[in-house]
């Protein structure tokens, strides 16, 4: 079946319309073949790609502190440390003068992705503090396939709950009651 293209005024057929059917085995096979072709074409540039990566990495300050974000009674921020793969997430009490000065004496480590990765791969999806500042919800992808597992951490004692949902898209947000968590699930063709 021929379809007129969306962005054009004339009635010319759109030869790529069939690619919109995400459930089609033909589309999935085509995408796999395109990805294999791309990898084959780029394989000759591996040394150049690595050289460029190292050059860019050399220009990055490896030990750094992000700009603190004030929210409620806290400042939330990230620290990067030389040699670590991922930034650590912290909070501290907001100074009485309203400044964004980090008080290291009241600093609390909220999440250390380096410890969670244990030398392997992780991708942190969502990082969401509950409105009452008592819980941290976060999502992790450990496979590289952009499928996320959901976790809730009690910030008072550090206890962790792994939520029994698989194949989540990594997004989440708290309801105002600080107990309800909304999240998205992936469809079968992800």
Where are the language model's segments positioned?
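Beta-propeller folds
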Residues: 1-190
């Amino acid at each position: 079946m021929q379809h007129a293209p969306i962005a054009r005024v004339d009635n010319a057929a759109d030869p790529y319309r069939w690619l919109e059917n995400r459930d089609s085995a033909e589309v999935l096979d085509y995408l796999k073949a395109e990805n294999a072709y791309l990898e084959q074409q780029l394989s000759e540039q591996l040394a150049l790609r690595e050289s460029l990566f190292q050059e860019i990495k050399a220009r990055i300050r490896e030990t750094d502190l992000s700009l603190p974000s004030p929210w409620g009674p806290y400042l939330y921020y990230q620290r990067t440390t030389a040699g670590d793969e991922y930034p650590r997430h912290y909070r501290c009490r907001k100074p009485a003068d309203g400044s964004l000065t980090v008080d290291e004496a009241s600093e609390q480590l909220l999440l250390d992705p380096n410890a969670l990765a244990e030398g392997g791969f992780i991708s942190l999806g969502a990082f969401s503090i509950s409105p009452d500042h008592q819980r941290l919800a976060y999502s992790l992808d450990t496979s590289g396939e952009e499928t996320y597992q959901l976790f809730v951490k009690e910030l008072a004692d550090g206890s962790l709950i792994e939520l029994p949902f698989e194949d989540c898209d990594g997004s989440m947000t708290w309801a105002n009651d600080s107990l309800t968590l909304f999240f998205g699930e992936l469809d079968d063709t992800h």
